Amino acid sequence: MTKAPYPVDLHTHTVNSDGNDTPYELVMNAAARGVKVLAVTDHDVPPPRTAQIPGNGEMDLVEFAKAQGVALIRGIEFSCETSVQDVHIVGLGCDWDGEIMAEEVKKIAHSKAAAYVETVRRLNERGYAMDMEEILSL
């Protein structure tokens, strides 16, 4: 495995958004590459508190990372629309249990659901037969 060019990575994704690794795999790969500080910043998804660790069951992700020599920061990458373009803002050190974050997570879920409905509508309009209920059941 190639050594990381820097010991800090403050913008990573897991399978919870558009990454390829589970939280466990992300930490293990970071540790193997010499990363000392790692932020999990999935798109519009609150960071995981725990992860499934092979042979150990579910563990606190920050504590597991620490045991691997990695300081883990729980973050999020917010998708934002502006009048010019879509932008992404990385949030680190957030109050994950606070009212403001709970409200933002609700807004994100509503926004994503509306976007999926609109995408299906557009695909149907262009002749691709899709049913939202069927998609949600997958």
Regions found by a protein language model. Give the residues of each.
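An N-terminally biased module of ancient metal coordination in phosphate/nucleic-acid-related enzymes
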Residues: 1-85
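Extended substrate/RNA-proximal surfaces in nucleic-acid metabolism proteins
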Residues: 60-138
